[in-house]
């Protein structure tokens, strides 16, 4: 979707009712006002769109205009604000002929360098290089690959003092993990900031003795490569597959008794995997299965989490029921399992609404680990 005013414009990707403003395409537009009214012209290349290779195309589309001073929004195809999926109420444009989807293939190589001064005022320089690849497998599925990525220019997190027993989850700012990830986050169990960032102390704390401390905690873990395939087929089945590999990272440990130092591995070679199957159903309903897994080399623990989430609406979309089930396991010397499940229901349309009324059951691991 795109929005424009006289001097500004933006584009976003819509997933259900969520607008992802980090979505960025190449397109052009022009806005004008004359005695006949307000006009907007858009020029969007076919490479920015996904459509099948058929002789006659039928597309969904909608147009809207917002008038802020009246708090008014007018749409070409009427939209019911009580329904959750804006896209399902798009208008139809039929009979588009003689267009061919272009090859969707992009290579984006990069080189970067960093210069810093050490404690002895010595100039230290580092160089990095890698590549991003995007390939349209077909009109439904897209492959994204990043090789030796450099996220040094990504916005830093704000400093937060955490005095609670729970971890603070920060927003994801790395472009590879924000584009086309709607399916991966739908079940709420995939937290991409685990990949390629500072290692949790619970991963390496059993290697440090009481009279020792880390000399330095690296702020990130080298990400060797990551890839994802995502899209939705004609039958409404959404597919998402993700894989990421991070390198081994070591640091020094200081012995507070004799001032000696030794080297330990704080982050082993790790492989992260995510699989998502998301099926659209009638009445704006859906069912989603997600599985996340991390494998770590050596004696470090591995983990697996699976989730099933479904939402069922009545034909009128007045009433709904949600259900989700999550099962997790931590594998080291022995397997520890945990699970949670819950449901909620309510009336979401009409002059009288209620809910959601919910219930949640949780059984945690005997040994809690990140």
Regions found by a protein language model. Name each.
Residues 107-119, 124-129, 239-247, 285-296, ...:
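Transmembrane beta-strand segments that form the barrel wall of outer-membrane beta-barrel proteins
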Residues 129-136, 227-231, 262, 271-281, ...:
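Feature captures outer-membrane beta-barrel proteins of Gram-negative bacteria and organelles
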Residues 2, 7-278, 288-289:
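Structural preference for beta-rich elements and adjacent junctions enriched in aromatics
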Residues 19-25, 82-83, 165-172, 181-185, ...:
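Short, Lys/Arg-enriched charge-dense amphipathic segments
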Residues 334:
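Aromatic- and carboxylate-enriched substrate-binding clefts and catalytic-loop regions
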Residues 1-6, 360-367:
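Conserved small/polar residues in nucleotide/adenosyl-binding loops
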Residues 168, 302, 337:
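Short acidic-hydrophobic sequence patches enriched in Asp/Glu that either
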């Amino acid at each position: 979707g795109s929005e424009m005013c006289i001097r500004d414009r933006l584009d976003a990707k819509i997933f259900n009712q969520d607008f992802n403003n980090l979505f960025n395409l190449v397109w052009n537009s022009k806005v004008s006002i004359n005695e006949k009214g307000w006009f907007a012209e858009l020029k969007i290349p076919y490479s920015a769109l996904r459509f099948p290779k058929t002789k006659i195309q039928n597309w969904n589309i909608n147009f809207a205009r917002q008038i802020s001073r009246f708090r008014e929004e007018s749409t070409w195809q009427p939209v019911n604000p009580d329904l959750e999926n804006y896209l399902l109420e798009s208008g139809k444009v039929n009979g588009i002929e003689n267009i061919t989807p272009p090859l969707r293939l992009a290579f984006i190589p990069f080189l970067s360098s960093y210069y810093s001064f050490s404690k002895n005022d010595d100039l230290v320089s580092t160089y990095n290089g890698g590549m991003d690849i995007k390939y349209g497998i077909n009109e439904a599925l897209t492959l994204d690959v990043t090789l030796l990525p450099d996220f040094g220019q990504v916005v830093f997190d704000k400093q937060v003092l955490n005095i609670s027993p729970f971890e603070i989850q920060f927003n994801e700012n790395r472009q590879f993990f924000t584009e086309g990830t709607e399916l991966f986050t739908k079940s709420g169990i995939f937290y991409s900031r685990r990949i390629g960032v500072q290692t949790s102390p619970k991963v390496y704390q059993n290697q440090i003795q009481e009279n020792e401390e880390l000399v330095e905690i690296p702020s990130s873990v080298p990400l060797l490569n990551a890839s994802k395939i995502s899209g939705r087929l004609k039958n409404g089945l959404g597919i998402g597959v993700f894989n990421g590999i991070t390198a081994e990272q070591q640091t020094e440990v200081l012995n507070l008794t004799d001032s000696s130092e030794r080297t330990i591995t704080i982050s082993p070679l790790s492989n992260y995997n995510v699989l998502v199957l998301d099926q659209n159903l009638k009445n704006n309903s859906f069912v989603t299965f997600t599985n996340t897994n991390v494998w770590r080399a050596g004696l470090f623990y591995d983990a697996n989490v699976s989730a099933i989430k479904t939402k069922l609406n009545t034909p009128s979309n007045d009433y709904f029921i949600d259900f989700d089930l999550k099962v997790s396991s931590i594998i080291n010397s022995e397997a520890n399992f945990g699970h949670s499940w819950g449901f909620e229901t309510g009336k979401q349309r009409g002059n009288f609404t209620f809910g959601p009324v919910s219930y949640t059951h949780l059984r945690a691991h005997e040994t809690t680990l990140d």
